[in-house]
């Protein structure tokens, strides 16, 4: 097990709502069973305009089921699931790396991910946020969706006001890219491009380049479940697009806690690799 991976787990355990002293508040909009507990199997809430309401605090279901190795096998016809450390863990043959990208991935992995931006209190990429053990909060309005990430205090904007996705290179590259969203029935479809070059998709260092486009499909089959199918199309680093599924669960009656990565950071000077 990588030393850096264990450090991430230790940080996540300290920062998670279950381990922290933070007041809970029983929200009135949470569907509840007769015993007063949240009814996770209830239908998802809807907004005033009839769309699925994705508002809430969510955490990665795979990680909090206690799994650290390979993810569970997806049913036939569904995208493979991913893990905190390895986005390609559910693919039998791994990711379709181009030769240079595979070499970079191996170098990052063998170096204990010491150059991962997250390890240096820098922003994580979108895929890392999806699979990170720390929770995230979705705030949904008709024209804008904000995702607040507890890890490294990340803030992401998804514009749902009808604006087109800019061409790659037309705007300043961002850590989180530029995102626009639209609805296909009850599915929220988010397209993102204009990423910074040299990105990390996971802790092991699967590359993401400035030529990437990411498409996320958000669905909520019930109140308690959030599914995000993520398609990575990065012809600079991979020979073909690929799709993974991230399963998350809602954390009702809880909020994010303050997480200032640099406040107590003392490990960077001691991180080593090959």
Give names to the regions the model predicted.
Residues 19-274:
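PEST-like low-complexity, intrinsically disordered acidic/proline/serine-rich tracts
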Residues 7-8, 18:
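Cleavable N-terminal signal peptides
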Residues 1-5:
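Positively charged n-region of N-terminal signal peptides that target proteins for export
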